[in-house]
Amino acid sequence: MNPMIFTSLLATIMLGTSIVLTSSHWFLTWLGFEMNMMAIIPVLMKKYNPRSMEAATKYFLTQATASMILVLAIIINLMYSGQWTIMIMENPTASMLITIALVMKLGLAPFHFWVPEVTQGVSLSSGLILLTWQKIAPLSLLYQIFPSINTNLLLIMSLLSIMIGGWGGLNQTQLRKIMAYSSIAHMGWMIAIMIYNPNLSLLNLLIYIMMTSSMFMLLIINSTTSTSSLSRAWNINPIVVSTMMVILLSLGGLPPLTGFMPKWMIIQELTKNSSVMLPSLMAILALLNLFFYMRLTYSTALTMFPTMNNMKLTWQFQSTNIMPMMMSLISMSMLALPLAPSLITLN
C-alpha cells in the first residue's frame, strides 16, 4: 500500500474516533463511527489475499449491522425525547438497542464470533489497531450513557465475555487468536466495573492498550504468528521472546506484574459495592486465561527442542534494535504494579 494512502487512512481512523470522543450529538457520533469503519477496512486488507478480504468482509458486515441497530436506537430515542443529545436516554428499548450495538462493535459475548476470525485473517500491524484503537470509540460512548444502561444485561455480557475469553484460548496455537480471546476477556472486565466506577474502566483500558501494544510490537519484531514459530524464535532472540512471555503473564494478571493491578482494583471496587459473588466468579474465570498463558510460556521457554551448539551461539551476537519509546512501553507493561497503592488512595 502507498505510504501516503496508508497515512491518510490512519489519520481518518483517528479523526473518526476523535469525533466520537468529543461529540455530544447522536448524528456526529454515528458519523464518527462510519468514518472509522470505512477507513479501517483498507487497512485490514493491506496484505491483499483471500484471507484478509474475508476478514475485512466479516468486519464490515458486523460493524454495518451494529451501525444499523445504532441508527434505529437513535431514531427511537428521538421519537420519545425529541433531543439529539447523547446524555438524554428516556426509552429503555433505545437504551437496550444502543447497548447491543456497542457490544457488537466491541466484540463482547455473545457477539464475539467475529473477533478471533478477523484478527487471524489480517496482518499483525492491522491486528494491533483492531484490538486497541478500535475499542476506544465504543467504550467512550458507553462511558457517556452508562447511567441509562440496563446493568443486569451488562453484567451478564461481561461474565460471558470473561468465560469465553478464557475457554476460547485454551486450545489455540495461533498467537493472533490468543490475543483476540484475551481482548474479549479484558473487555468483560472493563464492562463489569463501568457500572460501579467508570474511571476505573478507563484505567483498565489504558493498561490493556499498553500491554497489548507491547505484545504485538514484539510479535512484529520476531515475525511470529504461532506457538511453533515462537518456540523457534527462542534460539534466535531469547531476550525478546523472554520479554514476550513476561508480557503474556502480565496480560493474564499474574502478580507482581502490571496486569494484576486493574484486576486487583476492580475486585476491590466490586467488593466495596457489596458484590461478593460477581468478583469471585470473575477471579475464578480469569484463571482460565492465566492457565493458557502459563502453558504457552512453559512450552516456549522451558521445553526447548534439541539443537546443535552452533545454533545456540547465533543469538548471542544479534542486536534487537528496539526503540527507546518501545522499551518504555514494554517496561510499563511489566513493572507498573508499584503505582497501584497511590491509585487506590486517589480512588
From Swiss-Prot:
Similarity comment: Belongs to the complex I subunit 2 family.
Signal peptide location: none
Disulfide bridge partners, by residue number: none
Translocase found in the keyword field: yes
Assigned keywords, A-Z: Electron transport, Membrane, Mitochondrion, Mitochondrion inner membrane, NAD, Respiratory chain, Translocase, Transmembrane, Transmembrane helix, Transport, Ubiquinone
GO process terms (BP): mitochondrial electron transport, NADH to ubiquinone; mitochondrial respiratory chain complex I assembly
Job of this protein: Core subunit of the mitochondrial membrane respiratory chain NADH dehydrogenase (Complex I) which catalyzes electron transfer from NADH through the respiratory chain, using ubiquinone as an electron acceptor. Essential for the catalytic activity and assembly of complex I.
Membrane topology: Multi-pass membrane protein
Location in or out of the cell: Mitochondrion inner membrane
InterPro entries in the record: Complex_I_Subunit_2, NADH_DH_su2_C, NADH_UbQ_OxRdtase_chain2, ND/Mrp_TM
Protein name listed in UniProt: NADH-ubiquinone oxidoreductase chain 2
Enzyme Commission identifier(s): 7.1.1.2
Oligomer status and interactors: Core subunit of respiratory chain NADH dehydrogenase (Complex I) which is composed of 45 different subunits. Interacts with TMEM242.
Pfam families membership: NADH_dehy_S2_C, Proton_antipo_M
Predominant localisation class: mitochondrion
GO MF annotation list: NADH dehydrogenase (ubiquinone) activity
Cellular component, GO annotation: mitochondrial inner membrane
Chain segments annotated as transmembrane: 1-21, 25-45, 68-88, 96-116, 122-142, 145-165, 178-198, 201-221, 239-259, 274-294, 326-346
Organism whose genome encodes this protein: Sylvisorex lunaris
Keyword Iron-sulfur set for record: no
Catalytic activity: a ubiquinone + NADH + 5 H(+)(in) = a ubiquinol + NAD(+) + 4 H(+)(out)
